[in-house]
Amino acid sequence: MNNDNIAQLIADFPLIEKMVELKEVSWFNPNITSLQEGLPYVGLDNNNIQDASDRLARFAPYMVKAFPETAITNGIIESDVVEISAMKSQLEQQYEVEIQGKLLLKKDSHLPISGSIKARGGIYEVLTHAEQLAIKAEVLELSDDYSKLFTEEFKSFFSQYSIAVGSTGNLGMSIGIMSAKLGFSVSVHMSADARQWKKEKLRAHGVNVVEYNEDYSVAVEQGRQEAENDPKCFFIDDENSQTLFLGYSVAGERLKQQFDAMHIVVDENNPLFVYLPCGVGGGPGGVAFGLKMAFGDNVHCIFAEPTHSPCMLLGILTGLHDGIAVQDIGIDNITAADGLAVGRASGFVGRAMERLLDGFYTISDQRMYDLLGLLNKVEGIQLEPSALAGMLGPIVVTNNDEYLKRINMSNEKLVNATHLIWATGGGMVPAIEMEKYLSKAGS
């Protein structure tokens, strides 16, 4: 993209100038529609989510055997929702603003197996592929007890096949660990941002880790090429996969059940705001789709991105989607939020979800570190930097009168609001790494 194009983009979308200056910005989507209007553009519906949910239920007996830590939830990979009222008080004090309603944290950071939101989509896509291969080979039927997959016989069957994926870290962890457990040969192509401990953990599980000095897009492309050269190799495409997307979407119905158990009502007078950190977009996009299907127009999904990697905001704001990367406008895509270090958003997710997302904001690395330190101090919960991107959301929303007015959000409704921060990772960060993170937090 040449300077003339950039000048034209800035003329058309003045917000881009601030983004290029790495300022924290927010943008609330003027093109949002109702679920009914926006759903046809997704190309998926509740039947697809139900199918994903049923598949995960079929695999539950296997998961209990393969990963005993999932026995407590009967082989279903799910995380807790906790209220963080001390954090809410601290945020109100620091930002001198009153957050109406309650503040909750969704602890995907502490999901079993890989300790991140990617345990949803990544594991689901590996299981889907394994099921398809086994059914095609007539060694498995849908009515079988899937715990039979936890045998040497099946490990040997899956070992003829391989799986490849490109990742900044967390997706590679979930896909690598799951694939290796089933018996697949698996290669994870890791971008320059990937943390060393994640690579070491994967290698300990027998995963082939391929390292690059370039960013996420290069790692994905190399993974794609590996699969193209081998008919028995399956490439998990984080940029375009509907299967990954559906693995995440199951979270919506499950959250609804958790809210029911907690007596939390979501309706027109009791709105739900959900703040989701966004990298390439598959995880937050899939979760947001599931939330919309579960709560309809009463849930407001807002994506949070690092100031250095605002790829989904850039793609949806300009309507160019994956036709533009942050590097095209001079942003470096280098951030401490390694899980969000993506320069070019998923075109599939952007086009599918652009009418169903309320807004976007960007957050600096230092602010993520500061919030990480604060959450640890007042709630005793430790997350990785990218998982804190959503924590600023309630402040951004509360301070945006124009947006609240546009969605007819009266003060009476806001008092009853639930603000949910989706914590995307950090539960498996080694203590020495966590110390480094905490040392970067401001007092």
From Swiss-Prot:
Which keywords does this chain's UniProt record carry? Answer: Lyase, Pyridoxal phosphate
For this protein, the parts annotated as crossing the membrane are none
The reaction(s) catalysed by this protein are: D-serine = pyruvate + NH4(+)
User: Known InterPro entries for this protein?
Assistant: D_Ser_am_lyase, Ser/Thr_Dehydratase, Ser/Thr_deHydtase_PyrdxlP-BS, TrpB-like_PALP, TrpB-like_PALP_sf
Q: Which residues form a coiled coil?
A: none
A single GO molecular function term of this UniProt record: pyridoxal phosphate binding
For this chain's UniProt record, which GO biological process terms are given? D-serine catabolic process; isoleucine biosynthetic process
Domain of life from the UniProt record: Bacteria
EC top class named in words: lyase
**For the modification N6-(pyridoxal phosphate)lysine, which residues carry it?**
K118
Cofactors per UniProt? pyridoxal 5'-phosphate
Q: Give the similarity note.
A: Belongs to the serine/threonine dehydratase family. DsdA subfamily.
The protein's matches in PANTHER family, at most eight in alphabetical order, are given as: D-SERINE DEHYDRATASE, THREONINE DEHYDRATASE, MITOCHONDRIAL-RELATED
| Protein name according to UniProt | Probable D-serine dehydratase
Native organism: Colwellia psychrerythraea (strain 34H / ATCC BAA-681)
Q: Its gene?
A: dsdA
